[in-house]
């Protein structure tokens, strides 16, 4: 897929303008298995409108952590791309380090920026110190994926019977195991940025960070850990890698998958012959979560070029992919939601009615909360500490959740800046 995308970019760019007239910019993005098909759709339309710009694709990032680490290394080496796609929770570190460039000078030159769908709530996701540094490209939320053919083995045959709470999920797992389903459920604990741990915290309306205060030491934090333990034990959940998880569900091996809506396009394209339904993310009560963290990524200008032509070309590409027309391909090819208002209200007016599985996340939009980054220079290290601790629950290394809570809080607080 990656070779195909690069070939399309080069072929289209070469055929539409003389090489001497072209401005070449470099671009990097994460998750090739999700986004290659999206950029394959976007590039031809972009080149048709902008034949004087060539977009050179760099190797894709494996994750948002990889994306941030790669940019930090490239900044030191003087090898930055012009535009990078970064996790919404990883923009701040690039702003703090002076790597991301403010988009305010470019926005000021746009006559109809708001009319083009760039509303304030969208801009807020990429605003730091009262300036816009990133334009959100794709927004995701956690949802439930269900193989209804397998769910029928637990007596669940319609959407309104699907579990609404994690206790109900655990009960369904027991029924499915009794019915011979080997892997009843997979829960996305290992999705980038401790996203699902934050989801359990926001479910209780509790952010994981309050300033520099790590709030896993609260009753809500202990509830989050105990909820994961109950799910993993009740469902005999194996410890799978990310790509193996999606492949396994698409093959029909699991009855329930709790994951990002971002993977829906991939699952729909690759799934076996079974009835797939998505449904709202369960909560601790039947009322559902109070909030959920917004996942996704934003386009950030990190070019170290001083050439006005390069910077203008980079802005042209950055604006196009986040525009109504460009961002609409996000919804068509993935399960992400485009934050651009024009994409949702104009380009995709009837799309969600015709694609009910993709509408699930849209119904959860009122729950959107911040996907928090951990402050200071050790933010990525904090992510790893929590990843390791959660994996220990999956593997059975940790059984006493209060003891694990104390251990994680002590280790994380030592990595965070002091003061509120």
Report the location of each language-model feature.
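Glycine-centered hinge/linker elements that transmit conformational signals in sensory
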Residues: 170-176, 211-239
């Amino acid at each position: 897929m990656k070779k195909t995308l690069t070939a399309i970019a080069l072929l289209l760019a070469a055929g539409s303008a003389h090489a001497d007239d072209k401005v070449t910019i470099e671009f990097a993005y994460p998750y090739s298995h999700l986004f290659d098909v999206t950029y394959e759709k976007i590039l031809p339309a972009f080149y048709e409108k902008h034949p004087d710009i060539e977009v050179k694709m760099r190797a894709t990032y494996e994750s948002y952590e990889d994306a941030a680490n790669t940019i930090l290394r490239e900044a030191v080496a003087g090898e930055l791309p012009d535009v990078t796609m970064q996790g919404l929770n990883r923009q701040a570190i690039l702003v703090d380090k002076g790597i991301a460039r403010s988009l305010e000078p470019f926005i000021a030159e746009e006559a109809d920026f708001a009319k083009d769908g760039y509303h304030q709530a969208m801009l807020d996701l990429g605003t730091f110190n009262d300036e816009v540094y990133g334009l959100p490209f794709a927004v995701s939320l956690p949802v439930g994926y269900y193989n209804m053919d397998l769910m029928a083995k637990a007596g669940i045959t319609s959407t309104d019977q699907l579990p609404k709470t994690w206790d109900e999920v655990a009960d369904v797992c027991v029924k499915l195991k009794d019915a011979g389903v080997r892997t009843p459920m997979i829960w996305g604990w290992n999705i980038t940025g401790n996203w699902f741990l934050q989801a359990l915290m926001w479910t209780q309306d509790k952010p994981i960070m309050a300033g520099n205060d790590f709030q896993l030491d609260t009753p809500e934090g202990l509830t989050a850990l105990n909820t994961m333990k109950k799910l993993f034990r009740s469902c005999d959940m194996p410890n799978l890698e990310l790509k193996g998880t999606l492949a396994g569900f698409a093959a029909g091996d699991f009855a329930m998958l709790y994951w990002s809506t971002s993977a829906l396009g991939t699952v729909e394209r690759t799934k076996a012959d079974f009835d797939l339904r998505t449904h709202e993310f369960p909560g601790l009560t039947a009322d559902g979560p109070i909030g959920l963290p917004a996942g996704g990524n934003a386009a950030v200008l990190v070019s170290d070029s001083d050439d006005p032509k390069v910077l203008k070309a980079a802005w042209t590409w950055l604006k196009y992919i986040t525009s109504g027309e460009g961002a609409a391909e996000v919804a068509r090819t993935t399960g992400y939601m485009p934050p651009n208002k024009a994409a949702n209200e104009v380009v995709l007016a009837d799309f969600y009615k015709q694609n009910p599985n993709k509408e699930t996340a849209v119904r959860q939009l009122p729950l959107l909360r911040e996907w928090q980054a951990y402050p200071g220079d050790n933010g990525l290290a904090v992510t790893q500490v929590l990843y390791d601790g959660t994996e220990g629950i999956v593997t059975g290394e940790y059984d006493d959740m209060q003891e694990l809570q104390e251990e994680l809080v002590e280790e994380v607080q030592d990595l965070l800046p002091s003061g509120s």
